[in-house]
Amino acid sequence: MDKSLFYNPQKMLSYDRILNFVIGARGIGKSYAMKVYPINRFIKYGEQFIYVRRYKPELAKVSNYFNDVAQEFPDHELVVKGRRFYIDGKLAGWAIPLSVWQSEKSNAYPNVSTIVFDEFIREKDNSNYIPNEVSALLNLMDTVFRNRERVRCICLSNAVSVVNPYFLFFNLVPDVNKRFNVYDDALIEIPDSLDFSSERRKTRFGRLIDGTEYGEMSLDNQFIGDSHVFIEKRSKDSKFVFSIVYNGFTLGVWVDVNQGLMYVDTAHDPSTKNVYTLTTDDLNENMMLITNYKNNYHLRKLASAFMNGYLRFDNQVIRNIAYELFRKMRIQ
């Protein structure tokens, strides 16, 4: 297959964000590209790298790390010893399971400029996220990068779900129709794989999976773990009513009386006096703490809209947060 069809990270790297998320179709070459990049950085500049997986068993075959990319570097010796990577006899990088990040706190990595975290979004049949996973990755980044500027962490995943601990932690709500969602210090890239998918559909395996849920993820970069039920942009005639803050995320609640629908959105009126929260962790000035939603008119209406099927959510991330909110309210 033509090399130009595979993933090229250069545009993503040009944005120079410290934290990058790349979510692309399976087989498009994300992992391959993010092996080649740090190897090149070491050969040219002596910059080391760290390869991260979630748990130790996922590194059981790390001895094969260089196998697929060795052809790109015929004049260099690429060797793995334990969980260390060597290039031309020099230490180039480490493989680290995120689950043991605490054991890395006393280690120093002054020459590491790149962390690559592969499969950062858990797939259905894989192991669970580790407890406080985002904090674990941030602790590892802090240990490795310290206060250096020319550093970056690149997290890779297949198209599973935009609802994951990382996007929730940083309040990132990507537009899945845009290739690059760029924030102050982070970036989400959802590569366009149309040409790659067209060619892969011509293969025997591509024909086998075409039209299946697996094919939607592998060929079309569709987020198969996300439900589109009740996902709908709010109408232009909807009016803002109140806000509710949950886990640091502010949700705006809007109503369209003509359509008889209620919408939950990130958009809200920051000057409103109708701001509610369910936890003391979120409680702040000019908010009302609600311990029983049945005692509050607005939250009763929100719960009723949800239970009767006329509540809509702006996107999957908002939907997921709202569902957690309803579980907190003991509405199942």
From Swiss-Prot:
Signal peptide: none annotated. Transmembrane segments: none annotated. Residues 233-332 are annotated as: DNA-binding. Its EC number is 3.6.4.-. It is an enzyme of class 3 (hydrolase). The N-terminus contains the ATPase activity and the C-terminus (CTD) binds DNA. The CTD is likely a vestigial nuclease that has lost its hydrolytic capability since Phi-29 is not a concatamer that neads cleavage. This is DNA packaging protein. Keywords: ATP-binding, Hydrolase, Late protein, Nucleotide-binding, Viral genome packaging, Viral release from host cell. ATPase required for the genome encapsidation reaction. Part of the active packaging motor via the binding to the packaging RNA (pRNA), itself fixed to the head-tail connector at the unique portal vertex of the prohead. Binds and supercoils the pre-formed, unit-length DNA bound to gp3 to produce an initiation complex for DNA packaging. Provides the energy to actively pump the viral DNA into the prohead. Approximately one molecule of ATP is used in the packaging of 2 bp of viral DNA. InterPro entries: P-loop_NTPase, Podovirus_Gp16.
